A protein has these predicted regions:
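N-terminal "leader" segments that precede or initiate the main folded domain
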Residues: 1-81, 161-164, 177-210, 216-217, ...
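Membrane-interfacial loop-to-transmembrane alpha-helix junctions, especially the N-terminal start
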Residues: 14-24, 88-98, 151-158, 361-372
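Membrane-interfacial helix-loop-helix modules of multi-pass inner-membrane proteins that assemble, modify
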Residues: 37-46, 78-82, 97-132, 218-229
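Short aromatic-rich membrane-water interface segments that cap or initiate transmembrane helices
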Residues: 49-60, 119-134, 329-335
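Alpha-helical transmembrane segments of multi-pass inner-membrane proteins
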Residues: 62-76, 89-114, 130-170, 176-193
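Hydrophobic alpha-helical segments
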Residues: 114, 118, 137-138, 310-391
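Hydrophobic alpha-helical membrane segments of integral membrane proteins
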Residues: 155-156, 174-182, 197-201, 235, ...
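Small-residue-enriched transmembrane helix-hairpin modules in multi-pass membrane proteins
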Residues: 212-343
Length: 391
């Protein structure tokens, strides 16, 4: 079986999907701004933290929205139009079986050690956990999900999808649903099918189930490894559906908005600049366990990862961090002249490299996947996730 890469109209036919995601993002940040003006405190990861420079919030909102539009709009569109000669690969079926094997190993490792789950300590799983940093099974699945999709879905394709979903649920993550939702919308609009009643029924079903899934996520985060499946069943049987739905909408918008992270970073920019300039905290280029691991092997000390530092220093200074906080795309621009010059160049470079590889290896379908990775990773300031995807 060949990996076909020539999807000439895939990006143009799926443009509406990217516009929908940008619109939802716009709504979430405007929602955050409204909450800020009414309460004077942040939401999301920084819920309850007082805003220091309230007069700058509207300015930061406009910067945030414009950054998303520029990077995910004109910059991506221009780079994706560059013509790259495609490569044709054989053996997609073989790759599918290999991926399925590694997905099972990854799931067994995570369940047996409690590693890679939402809210777990970063040291969980020991040295073996580093193997999965350089063999990113989840990202390999995303790539296969896009380039391996055909009109008639194979059994091994479905098997990979099932094991991926079960693996993600066992770890308490739900962010993957945005990637798969984006993918399915892309496939739907690319096929140019008419909207059928069954799709509307499916959409209605998903809207009904969403609050339950959100509650399930909370249960998995808190009690899966302590209470087991019994705790999940207990939560589901006592759900207040209306309250769950309200919590889901507010929680979803609070989670995907970036304004709260950017406002917090702006309020503390002078202090954070001192930490970065004195190498106590690393800059964007050293963000993530792979880079930090390489630095230690080379005998370097780039400083603490910014995302971990934000949590351990400002949110939970009395305990070791078990989570990370997003920075937001434009936040690094606030840390002096050098950062405001080299940071955009760094971002532009990794976007260029990733789009070149995407067009070379997977054509426009893989470029479409790269867009959602830019949307979810680069625009959140989550460069570790994006660089792992690139590898």
């Amino acid at each position: 079986m060949y990996l076909t890469t020539n999807y000439c109209d895939f990006l143009s036919r799926t443009r509406i999907v990217r516009r929908i995601f940008l619109l939802v993002y716009l709504i979430s940040n405007v929602y955050a701004y409204i909450v800020f003006t009414e309460t004077g405190v942040l939401i999301g990861d920084y819920q309850g933290v007082l805003i220091i420079y309230k007069d700058q919030v509207v300015y930061l909102l406009m910067l945030t929205i414009m950054s998303y539009y520029i990077v995910c709009g004109p910059v991506f569109n221009c780079l994706s139009k560059v013509k790259i000669r495609l490569r044709t690969f054989k053996g997609l079926n073989s790759f599918a079986y290999i991926l399925f094997f590694f997905q099972i190993l990854f799931a067994v490792f995570n369940i047996s050690t409690g590693s890679n789950a939402a809210g777990t300590d970063f040291q969980t799983g020991g040295v073996i956990r580093l193997l999965w940093l350089f063999l990113p099974v989840d990202y390999l699945f995303y790539i296969y999900y896009f380039v391996g999709r055909e009109k008639k879905v194979s059994k091994i394709y479905l098997a990979n999808v099932v094991i991926f979903i079960l693996s993600m649920l066992s770890r308490g993550w739900l962010g993957w649903t945005l990637v798969l939702l984006y993918a399915e919308l892309c496939f739907f609009f690319y096929s140019q099918k008419k909207i059928k009643i069954k799709y509307l029924i499916l959409l209605f079903f998903l809207l009904i189930v969403a609050p339950l899934a959100f509650s399930l996520k909370i249960q998995l985060r808190a009690d899966l490894y302590s209470s087991g499946i019994g705790g999940v069943i207990s939560t589901l049987s006592n759900i207040d559906y209306i309250q769950s739905y309200n919590n889901f909408i507010a929680g979803f918008l609070s989670r995907i908005q970036q304004l709260s992270n950017i406002v917090f970073f702006y309020d503390h920019q002078q202090e954070l600049y001192k930490f970065v300039s004195s190498d106590i905290v690393s800059n964007y280029a050293w963000e993530g366990l792979p880079q930090q691991t390489v630095a230690k092997l080379l005998g370097l000390d780039p400083g603490v990862d910014m995302h971990i530092f934000l949590y351990s220093h400002y949110i939970s200074s009395t305990s070791e961090a078990v989570t990370t906080l997003q920075v937001g795309f434009i936040s690094w621009l606030f840390l002096g002249t050098l950062s405001s010059v080299f940071y955009p160049l760094f971002v532009f470079a990794i976007i260029c490299i990733s789009l070149f590889l995407s067009k070379k290896l997977g054509g426009e379908k893989l470029c479409a996947l790269t867009w959602i990775m830019i949307f979810l990773s680069i625009m959140c300031g989550w460069y570790n996730a994006y660089l792992v995807y690139m590898q």
